[in-house]
Structure formats: structure tokens, C-alpha cells
UniProtKB/Swiss-Prot annotation:
It comes from Xanthomonas campestris pv. campestris (strain B100). The gene is surE. Gene3D superfamilies: Survival protein SurE-like phosphatase/nucleotidase. GO terms for molecular function: 3'-nucleotidase activity; 5'-nucleotidase activity; exopolyphosphatase activity; metal ion binding; nucleotide binding. Pfam families: SurE. Nucleotidase that shows phosphatase activity on nucleoside 5'-monophosphates. Its EC number is 3.1.3.5. SUPFAM superfamilies: SurE-like (SSF64167). Belongs to the SurE nucleotidase family. It catalyses: a ribonucleoside 5'-phosphate + H2O = a ribonucleoside + phosphate. InterPro entries: SurE (IPR030048), SurE-like_Pase/nucleotidase (IPR002828), SurE-like_sf (IPR036523). Keywords: Cytoplasm, Hydrolase, Metal-binding, Nucleotide-binding. It is an enzyme of class 3 (hydrolase). Binds 1 divalent metal cation per subunit. This is 5'-nucleotidase SurE.
């Protein structure tokens, strides 16, 4: 298969290099199109106000001065001279569990692939303090999942969010299909002073686990399993449709009220 690989940790990150090499060893044709620096937390942002510069590192690698979503968008809308078959994003050097997917550039790169018509997988290694020891485990998991997707495709609106415990392959207890868990609200932002005495802020850490019981991605990884969460991008809250529909009469009447 022709595999487009991207990430949010940057084109020089070890995770993406190990992933690309593992996919090549498995017989895939791999093109890496990734940010020229760390763009973690970029979510689904596209660069629309300035042109995006790219730099070919070699025949199989391109660095992009943009977000993960920019990378996949450019690669799939004309920058490459061929059409990939699948998008694989990662390997992220930290978890993308539960609410993390909202902010994750890793997941968003996969999501852009899905928007543009390709199967897509996001792969993250659940590390402690970003100190990764077993990228090769996550890479092997990705290779196995890509093979399964080729043999048994999923519905066209499905993205796979994969989180891998930072363990040797032999120590992983298995794969689990999971749902997204939830975190408590984020920790407070951290104020500091710059050299001129002006207040600046750091975004605080993600909140601790809240909904993290059996069946969630949090629980699977915590118990030594590789979590596979099928996700999609329909954000409609169907359970609220009837309630909001009940507002419509009053809202419509307000159109006739004096300004």
C-alpha cells in the first residue's frame, strides 16, 4: 500500500521515523509529510493567512512549515504526484486518550485524511513525562492494524485512535476495542513574568482521569493492553435535538418582536 505518514511531534521526531521504517519493512511504499517542528496541540487548524513553505529532505520525506492538518491536506490535494491509500499519523510521544483527541494534532492529521477520503489511523505511545522506551511496540501495532484495514475495511467515516502502553511487545497483554474515556477539567494555567516584568501564561496540564473504568481507552492502557478506539467526526448531540426543537417556536416568535 501507499502510506502517507504524518505527526505533530515534527518530521525529526523518533516516533515518526521508527513508524515509517516499520511500514517500509512490511512492504509498504511510505511518504512522510510532517511539520518542520513540534506542533503538538494544533488540533484541526489549517493555515489560511500565509502561504505554506515546504522542504524536501529526501525523496521520501517532506517537512512543512505548518500544522499536522496542513501536512495531510497538502499531501492529498495535489502536492504529491500520486494518491496514497491510507494515512497513518504518529507515533506520538505521549497519550491521546479520552478528551485529548480534541486537541491532538496526531489525531487531527488522521482526521484530515479521513475527511479527504482515505482510511486513517492515529498511533500514540503512552509515555511518562515524554520519556519513550518502546516506539517499536507502537510501530508493530500500527503495521498489524494497517494490514487488518486492508483486509477488512471499515466504514468510510471511521478513524482509528490507537494508544499503546510503553512496554516491550512481549509484555503487551493484548488488544482491546475501547470507547473514549474522559478527564477532569484541565489544571489551572500557570502565570509567570517575562524579563520586562509582564505577565505571561503557560497552559496548565491536562486534568486527571475521570471516566476511566473498564471499556475505556484509559483502562485498556493502564492494564497493559493496546487500545483501539473507532471514532468519527459527527459532533451532533442527538439526545438534545428534541429539547432544542422545543425552543424553536419561541425563538421564531422573537423574530416578530420589536427590535
Amino acid at each position: 500500500m501507499r502510506v502517507l505518514v504524518s505527526n505533530d511531534d515534527g518530521v525529526d521526531a523518533p516516533g515518526i521515523q521508527i513508524l515509517a521504517e516499520a511500514l517500509r519493512r512490511a512492504g509498504h511504499e511510505v511518504m512522510v509529510v510532517a511539520p518542520d517542528r513540534d506542533r503538538s496541540g494544533a488540533s484541526n487548524s489549517l493555515t489560511l493567512d500565509v502561504p505554506i513553505r515546504t522542504r524536501r529532505i529526501d525523496a521520501q520525506t517532506c517537512a512543512v512549515a505548518g500544522t499536522p492538518t496542513d501536512c495531510v491536506h497538502l499531501a492529498l490535494t495535489g502536492m504529491l504526484d500520486y494518491d496514497p491509500d491510507i494515512v497513518v499519523s504518529g507515533i506520538n510521544n505521549s497519550a491521546n486518550l479520552g478528551d485529548d483527541v480534541i486537541y491532538s494534532g496526531t489525531v487531527s492529521a488522521a482526521m484530515e485524511g479521513r475527511f479527504l477520503g482515505l482510511p486513517a489511523v492515529a498511533v500514540s505511545l503512552v509515555t511518562q513525562n515524554h520519556e519513550a522506551h518502546h516506539f517499536e511496540t507502537a510501530a508493530r501495532a500500527a503495521v498489524e492494524i494497517v494490514a487488518r484495514l486492508k483486509a477488512d475495511p471499515l466504514p468510510a467515516d471511521t478513524i482509528l485512535n490507537v494508544n499503546v502502553p510503553d512496554l516491550a511487545w512481549a509484555d503487551v497483554l493484548g488488544f482491546e476495542v475501547t470507547r473514549l474515556g474522559n478527564r477532569h477539567r484541565s489544571e489551572p494555567c500557570v502565570p509567570q513574568s517575562d524579563p520586562r516584568g509582564r505577565t505571561v501564561y503557560w497552559i496548565g496540564p491536562a486534568g486527571p482521569e475521570q471516566d476511566a473504568g473498564a471499556g475505556t481507552d484509559f483502562h485498556a492502557v493502564r492494564t497493559g493492553h493496546i487500545s483501539i478506539t473507532p471514532i468519527h467526526v459527527d459532533l451532533t448531540r442527538y439526545q438534545a435535538l428534541d429539547t432544542v426543537a422545543g425552543w424553536v417556536g419561541g425563538l421564531t416568535a422573537a423574530l416578530d418582536a420589536p427590535a
